[in-house]
């Protein structure tokens, strides 16, 4: 399961975002829907289920389906708070960077209203530019990667003087513990014009440009423009968007209020919906709070933006699609009769054999062929899967 880190400075709503995103209580298989550890929790990728399209009543086992909407568990990490100088170990810098080693992508929660300074101290709304926060996080990550590469750089460059590929391998070895792939490094080298140039000729500026590209590829980031209901957040949101960064407007506080109300059975609300329904007797303060959320957030922005941020990160940044493996292509069920039991998130471009390995190593090792259940067609190992495919894996080895 891929892991997305939620980052941000103090007082921007980072922990509120994390709490709201991970508090939905739904019974799914054997997943522990408490916090995995003090700073890792389960959120959900929300997608339209194929059950209604295929005219079946599903019985999910690794996810949940609510009125034709499939919620698939994903992992979020509440990364230690960040202050300038983290790359040098200031504050919780070392903890922050250690957390980030594991992350496949980031959600950077920023105070779009500009009501906190660079250190997270409360100030007059509009007196701080949230783009400064975005740049400082990017800068700290770049310096962190740069420092890792610079350590032993002389040795790396000398030992690969006559063998460029050896240099690439050594760079990958230095960064492999950070969930950075060799392919990411090669893409970054190509983008910076350093391909096949002797490493001994690379300047520190070359290295800095290289790590910037690596960071964009290996730690792609969605900006969650939080406190969107406060002025001048909408203007700052547009300003951030104009830089070409991936940005979603949100109100983490509004989402947390709605999820808590739904948890107490006061309202009916599914994360990401543009509406909620009051189903219990409410006091005047509760009614007023919900009316404000509807007026200031949902009616204006379509939703609170928290679920949209999660979905955008996993679907657009990480390039994941949803596939439904089954054991019987006619009944669309597993051996216990559960219809559309599992929904898996896999990388766009993945093959039938990739899916087999994701389900279980034994299935992958014994892979013979797969069946596209929609079309009733037999497909081979290299068949590229599409979003919402329903697939049966036929293997010489049983699933363990």
Model-derived features: positions:
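Conserved G1/Walker A P-loop phosphate-binding module
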Residues: 1-162, 175, 216, 220
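C-terminal-of-GTPase-core extension/linker across diverse P-loop GTPases
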Residues: 2-7, 12, 18, 153-390, ...
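S4-like RNA-binding module at protein N-termini
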Residues: 48-49, 57, 385-387, 391-392
């Amino acid at each position: 399961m891929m892991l997305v880190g939620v980052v941000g400075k103090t007082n921007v709503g980072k922990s509120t975002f994390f709490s709201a995103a991970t508090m939905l209580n739904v019974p799914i298989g054997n997943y522990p829907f408490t916090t995995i550890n003090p700073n890792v929790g389960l959120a959900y990728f929300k997608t339209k289920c194929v059950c209604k399209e295929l005219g079946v009543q599903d019985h999910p086992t690794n996810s949940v389906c609510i009125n034709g909407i499939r919620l698939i568990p994903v992992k979020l990490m509440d990364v230690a708070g960040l202050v300038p100088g983290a790359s040098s170990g200031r504050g919780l810098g070392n903890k922050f960077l250690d957390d980030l080693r594991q992350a496949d992508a980031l959600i950077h929660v920023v105070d779009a209203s500009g009501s906190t300074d660079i250190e997270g101290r409360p100030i007059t709304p509009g007196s701080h530019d949230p783009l400064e926060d975005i740049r400082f996080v990017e800068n700290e990550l770049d310096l962190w990667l740069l420092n890792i590469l610079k350590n032993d750089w002389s040795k790396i460059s000398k030992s690969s003087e006559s063998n460029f590929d050896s240099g690439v391998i050594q760079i990958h070895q230095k960064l492999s513990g950070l969930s950075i792939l060799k392919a990411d490094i090669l893409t970054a080298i190509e983008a910076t014009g350093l391909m096949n140039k002797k490493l001994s000729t690379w300047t520190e500026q070359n290295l800095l440009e290289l790590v910037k590209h690596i960071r964009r590829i290996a730690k792609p980031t969605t900006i969650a423009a939080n406190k969107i209901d406060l002025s001048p957040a909408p203007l700052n949101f547009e300003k951030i968007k104009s830089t070409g960064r991936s940005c979603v407007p949100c109100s983490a506080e509004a989402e947390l209020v709605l999820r808590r109300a739904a948890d107490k059975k006061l309202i009916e609300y599914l994360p990401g919906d543009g509406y909620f329904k009051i189903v219990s007797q409410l006091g005047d303060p509760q009614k007023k709070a919900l009316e404000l959320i509807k007026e200031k957030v949902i009616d204006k922005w379509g939703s609170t933006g928290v679920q949209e941020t999660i979905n955008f990160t996993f679907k657009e940044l990480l390039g994941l699609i949803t596939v439904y493996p089954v054991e019987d292509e006619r009944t669309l069920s597993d051996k216990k009769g559960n219809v559309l039991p599992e929904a898996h998130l896999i990388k766009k471009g993945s093959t039938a054999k990739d899916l087999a390995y994701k389900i279980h190593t034994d299935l992958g090792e014994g892979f013979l062929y797969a069946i596209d259940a929609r079309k009733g067609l037999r497909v081979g190992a290299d068949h590229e899967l599409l979003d919402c495919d329903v697939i049966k894996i036929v293997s010489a080895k049983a699933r363990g």
